[in-house]
């Protein structure tokens, strides 16, 4: 958790985070769509992705010159009636946290996977081969 203190109140500056166990339950119940923001090289090094995850270029998400509307249009069709779970392998979940903020501003129920793909894998949860 990254925290800051404002007026004596400590708060997580990265809200809307979901732990791997809760994410897995949502995915297995068919309640979530998963977005993979790993770089292809890092994803390959980890040897896989969360089953059914849709890949999104982290470069596009981290490009501060792109407008929010452009980012949302560049994404695969996302259902508004499902939870969106984004993950990456960035330090401090940078790409997935930014995408989560963008999607929430657009009215999606979006969450960042705490610890990203490494945490999912460390928990021993299912992985599938990366798309060729």
Q: PLM features: residue spans?
A:
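Flexible, polar/low-complexity N-terminal or interdomain linker segments that lie immediately upstream
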Residues: 1-45, 130-132
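Conserved beta-strand scaffold positions in the cores of enzyme catalytic domains, especially
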Residues: 34, 53-55, 110-112
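Short loop/helix-cap segments at secondary-structure boundaries that form the rim of catalytic
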Residues: 44-51, 120
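Active-site regions of enzymes building and remodeling cell-envelope glycoconjugates
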Residues: 49-59
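Short, hinge-like loop/turn segments at secondary-structure boundaries
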Residues: 51-52, 127-131
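Short, acidic/turn-prone active-site loops that include or flank metal/cofactor-
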Residues: 57-63, 115-117
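Short, charged, surface-exposed secondary-structure boundary motifs
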Residues: 62-69, 120-123
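Catalytic cysteine-centered active loop of the rhodanese-like fold, especially the PTP/DSP P-loop
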Residues: 71-121
